[in-house]
């Protein structure tokens, strides 16, 4: 029996029945029952002789669909449609196999399912799929750009409309317009004004303020746009750091100039302290200045109009020794001294003293020499010539006393310096090692003026320098 609707007009032979009959009895029985029902439906007269032949023919016809590797190992029990062969007789008349397009052979017409053909409408023609920018799609964009050359900034609504027409995405449309604006600027050097506010209020634009930005000459590539932004930011940060460094250097230079200008150079009167003014009678010349040093080194001439040097090694090397030594602690707090300044900060025409703490050190005889003591006043403002004249009156009073009272006169002469200078009474008992050799030549003139023939006067004079 044949099945023309399946396309396999095969007939069962005795040898095939003997081969497949003994191995799968259960499957053959089920297949025989199904084949008998199909034969009864087709002929309408089922007979007992036809039942056996129809069952074997149904199995062999189904197995004929497969090649020899499937039929040789006897996979008939695993075929899915062996028990449902009655369906094919009813479905065969519903399909018109003559109009089959020919992609598949006619033998598979019963098993065909609705499939998508390559390059069809639904698979590759989906409008939601992004499309590459072609000349046809960009032609619409070029036409819009030519119409809006004065203001080539489409609003968001216009971009959506152009994206629908050209089947492109909004990002592609925006990038195309950005590149087109760069090309126009490069070719024609055209600059555009501000956008109209009405379009922005209605639709809004994602390119607001593009005309204010400095656009690069190169076009934007969507793949490397993030990397380009990072590189630009790094370049801007490096430029900003260099600018900040330059600003810090300039500010430091300005501050140093301000500090130099703040170092005030006072006038010669302002530099002269009150104590040094009383000592400066000998400085009659205004061009040259004598620096009085207590170390007995004499007077040092300073050249006029010497420019001050800030922290100069040569200036510190040539400065007096007293300037490098620290001042001794003051014993009396009644007298004040001018503020100590470095010699480099002082002008050339000012009189300044050596850096020895208080003024009472100048009255100490241990630090004075013969040249410096003559022109200086004592702490009480008494000139040495006046002191010699005062001592002369005391000596005349003591000369009237007999020689037996020489000891008493020496005691009275010890009390007179206590009356004139009571603050120096505590210095009589202090031993001085350097004062006797330095004080003898300074009082030599006083001794010659008041010389007498009596021995008591010499004793009185020896007691006077101790005061």
Swiss-Prot record:
GO terms for cellular component: nucleus. PROSITE patterns: HOMEOBOX_1, HOMEOBOX_2. It is found in: Nucleus. GO terms for molecular function: DNA-binding transcription factor activity, RNA polymerase II-specific; RNA polymerase II cis-regulatory region sequence-specific DNA binding; transcription cis-regulatory region binding. Induction: By wnt signaling. Mutually antagonizes bmp4 signaling. Inhibited in the neural plate by foxd5. The anterior limit of expression at the future border between the prethalamus and thalamus is defined by mutual repression with the anterior repressor fezf2, and also by arx. Induced by retinoic acid (RA) during kidney development. Residues 245-262, 415-431 have a biased composition (Basic and acidic residues). SUPFAM superfamilies: Homeodomain-like (SSF46689). GO terms for biological process: brain development; cell development; cell fate specification; dorsal/ventral pattern formation; ectodermal placode development; maintenance of kidney identity; mesoderm development; midbrain-hindbrain boundary development. Residues 126-188 bind DNA. Its main location: nucleus. The keyword Transcription applies. Expressed early in neural differentiation in the neural plate, and expression continues in the neural tube after neural fold closure. Expressed in the presumptive midbrain territory. Also expressed in the prospective neural crest and the preplacodal field, anterior to the neural plate. Strongly expressed in the profundal placode and weakly expressed in the trigeminal placode. Residues 447-460 have a biased composition (Polar residues). Residues 215-225, 233-244 have a biased composition (Acidic residues). Keywords: Activator, Developmental protein, Differentiation, DNA-binding, Homeobox, Neurogenesis, Nucleus, Repressor, Transcription, Transcription regulation. Signal peptide: none annotated. Pfam families: Homeobox_KN (PF05920). It comes from the Eukaryota. Acts partially redundantly with other irx members in neural patterning. Required for formation of the posterior forebrain, midbrain, hindbrain, and to a lesser extent, spinal cord. Acts early in neural plate development to induce expression of some but not all proneural genes, and specify a neural precursor state. Also up-regulates repressors that prevent neuronal differentiation. Patterns the neuroectoderm in both the anterior/posterior and dorsal/ventral axes. Belongs to the TALE/IRO homeobox family. This is Iroquois-class homeodomain protein irx-1-A. It comes from Xenopus laevis (African clawed frog). The lineage of its organism: Eukaryota, Metazoa, Chordata, Craniata, Vertebrata.
